[in-house]
UniProtKB/Swiss-Prot annotation:
Keyword line: Metal-binding, Pyrimidine biosynthesis, Zinc
Similarity-based family: Belongs to the PyrI family.
Function comment: Involved in allosteric regulation of aspartate carbamoyltransferase.
Protein name per UniProt: Aspartate carbamoyltransferase regulatory chain
Subunit composition and interactions: Contains catalytic and regulatory chains.
Species: Methanosarcina mazei (strain ATCC BAA-159 / DSM 3647 / Goe1 / Go1 / JCM 11833 / OCM 88) (Methanosarcina frisia)
Amino acid sequence: MKEKRDLKVQAIESGTVIDHIKSGQALNVLRILGISSAFRATISFVMNAPGAGGKKDVVKIEGKELSVEELNRIALISPKATINIIRDFVVVQKNNVVLPSYVEGVVRCTNSSCISNSSEPIKSKFSVIQSEEEGVSLHCLYCEHVISEEIAENLL
């Protein structure tokens, strides 16, 4: 029996497709990118779509190409995501996100005693570690606190 495959989300003329997002993280990707109801371009997303490696999310953004900083933020919550740049309905560039080794001012330290959470004008600073067993974790350079599970919830 032949399996029927339908296109679930309309193709975009130009913009960005973020594929292979960790399942359940599409809304966090939109938040990372600062996309809200005020954003006027077309945005499509699919959550929990079947993929070769299990379930995944996909986000399509019409008329927007992502900056390096935006890609770094996405990598923190979905290090296996791929970015496709679309022009005239054709993929002109395809890249994997690259997990940065260091981030500054991107995530709030969850240690309430950390100096980056005080009234001082200090941006948070983290070294980024990835392991097969534990995934992505952030190590605060000020207080040495480790964040792993709640990265998405503490993005600035």
